[in-house]
C-alpha cells in the first residue's frame, strides 16, 4: 500500500477519505530524479500548507521509502483544484556548484569529492551520504577536469556516469540517511 507524506505529515493513504489525492503518477527513471504529480481538492486538510521548494514529499510502499522530493509547482485551476508537481531528490544536485577542477585518481574518490562539495553548499535535507561505488576503471585511475564551474548535477553526469565509465546513480533511503550510489549494475530503481 502506497502512502505519501509532506514534511512527515500523512498526506495520502488510500483508506482515509479526507486524505484523498487524485491522478497520482510517480515516475522513476534510470539516472534521473523522477517526478511525482498529483491533484488535490480544496477540502484536503493540507491544501494550503504545501510550499514550493520547501515542503519535502516522501512516498512509501509498505513503510519502505521509495522516493523523496520537493514541490516545484502547485498550479490551481478555476475549480480550486491544485496540480502538484514534485522533482526527486537527485535534482537537488542542481542546487550546488562544483568549481573548476583537475582530478586524477580512483572513480570513487572523484564521486566522493563531488558529493562532499555538494553537501557543503546545501541544507541538511538536501544532502546525501556517499553510498556504494561499484564502478571500476581498469587501472583504478582516471583523469577528469573542467575549466569552468559546473552545476553539481552536470559534473556528476559528464564526469561520472555519462563518461566512458558509465553506470547508474541510485538513491537508497535508509534509516540513517539518504545514500547516493554509483553502480555498475542496478540493484533496484529508486
Language-model region placement:
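Juxtamembrane "anchor/assembly" segments of surface/extracellular structural proteins
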Residues: 1-51, 87-93, 99, 109
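Charged- and aromatic-enriched interaction segments used to assemble
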Residues: 81, 87-190
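Short amphipathic beta-strand and strand-loop transition segments with alternating hydrophobic
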Residues: 19-28, 71-76, 169-171
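Acidic surface patches and DE-rich sequence motifs
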Residues: 6, 13, 61, 77, ...
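Hydrophobic beta-strand residues in large extracellular and virion-surface proteins
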Residues: 2-4, 36-38, 57-59, 71, ...
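A short, compositionally biased
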Residues: 1, 49-55, 164-166, 176
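Short amphipathic beta-strand/extended segments with alternating polar/hydrophobic composition
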Residues: 11-17, 67-72, 190
Amino acid at each position: 500500500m502506497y502512502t505519501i507524506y509532506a514534511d512527515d505529515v500523512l498526506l495520502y493513504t488510500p483508506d482515509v477519505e479526507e486524505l484523498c489525492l487524485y491522478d497520482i503518477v510517480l515516475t522513476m527513471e534510470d539516472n534521473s530524479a523522477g517526478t511525482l504529480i498529483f491533484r488535490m481538492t480544496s477540502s484536503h486538510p493540507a491544501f494550503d500548507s504545501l510550499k514550493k521548494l520547501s515542503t519535502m514529499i516522501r512516498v512509501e510502499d509498505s513503510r519502505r521509502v521509495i522516493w523523496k522530493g520537493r514541490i516545484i509547482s502547485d498550479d490551481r485551476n478555476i475549480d480550486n483544484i491544485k496540480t502538484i508537481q514534485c522533482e526527486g531528490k537527485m535534482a537537488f544536485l542542481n542546487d550546488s556548484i562544483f568549481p573548476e577542477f583537475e582530478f586524477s585518481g580512483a572513480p570513487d574518490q572523484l564521486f566522493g569529492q563531488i558529493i562532499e562539495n555538494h553537501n557543503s553548499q546545501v541544507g541538511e535535507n538536501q544532502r546525501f551520504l556517499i553510498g556504494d561505488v561499484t564502478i571500476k576503471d581498469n587501472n583504478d585511475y582516471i583523469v577528469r577536469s573542467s575549466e569552468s564551474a559546473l552545476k553539481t548535477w552536470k559534473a556528476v553526469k559528464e564526469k561520472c556516469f555519462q563518461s566512458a565509465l558509465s553506470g547508474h546513480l541510485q538513491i537508497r533511503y535508509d534509516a540513517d540517511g539518504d545514500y547516493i550510489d554509483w553502480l555498475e549494475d542496478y540493484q533496484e530503481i529508486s
